[in-house]
């Protein structure tokens, strides 16, 4: 298939683009220029790879989940272990790349948004490493849900700003972070945490996260002598999924499955299934599928997992849905919790609640596949951060 996105204006079909105020246009153009140069600079690539290897701990293993495979009785199940990265999730693949870019551009300060706190921790971590000042915006509700991550960020030297506006979640944190960037743009780089925002952010994040899919491809071929038949990843904004899917987009024999949060059910108001239930609109500088009402007001997204309750989804996912290259599904809070417990009991691996959505969908998919077929799950993060809230949730139930 002929797939080459984004185009030079930063569009993925009708999606993406740069819907930003004049005050930011210069900065996003400057960022695009700096990014292009860095990508062609061997020294930059060498430095990035050095940190990915010695600091992040790449490459991460592709693990054959024998017990899960036996339990499902279908396809061989493999886990791409992004939970084993330094800081416990895929987020650092992107933050290390963007922080090196910030240093290259002569910026002294970094601003970022965070939902579950994973991107905030990964950003604060690389800022500590590279001596950058760090400000993190986090919704008030998420601050409550993720107290430990807030403390971690502060330990790492970051200033955490709690955002009470709106629903006090990720969307509101992004609003405030963008506002902050507008007024500090001369010395500050904004590290977007997902494949969202105005061009070139969705491309930058996708490219830095593509290390996931590139490694998976190589590792799976070494183990099985072919490509996997199916690849599954969870989707909030969509960066772990985009990093996993992008290297496989041209391999049409590989089925790609994105898994959103159905929350209390897609028939209710309490979900974050943007690609299942959303419509096209503009948010945070980019055109994409959104959860919005008939007046175009953004609706609140809900998920048991703080990292999936974003009311939009990356522009590239929006395109991949429309052209049918990726098949998007949703998993409820209860299904994700069940998968969380199952993987923990069967493999001794505690997945993040976000990743548990991908595991839950894989549990439905694997039994429908043949025994000589392979299914890879992107295990995007570890579940230590969620154990406390899961304990609470299970006690209430």
Swiss-Prot record:
Keywords, ordered alphabetically: Amino-acid biosynthesis, Aromatic amino acid biosynthesis, Lyase, Pyridoxal phosphate, Tryptophan biosynthesis
Organism: Bacillus cereus (strain AH187)
Function text: The beta subunit is responsible for the synthesis of L-tryptophan from indole and L-serine.
HAMAP family: Trp_synth_beta
Name of this chain's protein: Tryptophan synthase beta chain
Subunit and interaction comment: Tetramer of two alpha and two beta chains.
EC number in record: 4.2.1.20
Swiss-Prot/TrEMBL catalytic activity: (1S,2R)-1-C-(indol-3-yl)glycerol 3-phosphate + L-serine = D-glyceraldehyde 3-phosphate + L-tryptophan + H2O
């Amino acid at each position: 298939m002929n797939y080459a996105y984004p185009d030079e204006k930063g569009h993925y079909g009708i999606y993406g683009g740069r819907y930003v105020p004049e005050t930011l246009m210069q900065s996003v153009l400057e960022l695009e220029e700096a990014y292009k140069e860095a990508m062609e600079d061997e020294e930059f690539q060498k430095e990035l790879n050095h940190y990915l290897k010695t600091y992040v701990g790449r490459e991460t293993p592709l693990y054959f989940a024998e017990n899960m495979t036996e339990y499902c009785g279908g396809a061989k199940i493999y886990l791409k272990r992004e939970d084993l990265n330094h800081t416990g999730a895929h987020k650092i693949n992107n933050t290390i790349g963007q922080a090196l870019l910030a240093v290259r551009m002569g910026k002294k300060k970094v601003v970022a948004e965070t939902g579950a706190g994973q991107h905030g921790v990964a950003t604060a971590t690389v800022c500590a490493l590279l001596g950058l000042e760090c400000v993190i915006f986090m919704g008030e509700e998420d601050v409550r849900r993720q107290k430990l991550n807030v403390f971690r960020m502060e330990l790492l030297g970051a200033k955490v700003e709690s955002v009470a506006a709106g629903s006090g979640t990720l969307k509101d944190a992004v609003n405030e972070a963008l506002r902050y960037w507008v007024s500090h743009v001369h010395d500050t780089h904004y590290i977007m945490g997902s494949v969202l925002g105005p061009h070139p952010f969705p491309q930058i994040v996708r490219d830095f996260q593509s290390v996931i899919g590139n490694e998976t491809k190589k590792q799976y071929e070494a183990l099985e002598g072919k490509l996997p038949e199916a690849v599954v990843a969870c989707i909030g904004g969509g960066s772990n999924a985009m990093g996993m899917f992008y290297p496989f987009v041209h391999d049409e024999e590989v089925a790609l499955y994105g898994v959103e949060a159905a929350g209390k059910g897609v028939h209710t108001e309490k979900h974050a299934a943007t690609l299942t239930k959303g419509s096209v609109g503009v948010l945070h500088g980019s055109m994409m599928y959104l959860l919005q009402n008939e007046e175009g007001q953004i609706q609140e997204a809900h998920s048991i997992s703080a990292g999936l309750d974003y009311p939009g989804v990356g522009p590239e996912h929006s395109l991949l849905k429309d052209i049918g290259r990726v098949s998007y599904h949703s998993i409820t809070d209860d299904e994700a919790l069940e998968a969380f417990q199952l993987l923990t009991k069967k493999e001794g691996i505690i997945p993040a609640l976000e990743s548990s959505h991908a595991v839950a969908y894989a549990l439905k998919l694997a039994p429908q596949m043949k025994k000589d077929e392979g299914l890879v799950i992107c295990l995007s993060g570890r579940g230590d951060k969620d154990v406390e809230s899961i304990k609470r949730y299970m006690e209430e139930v």
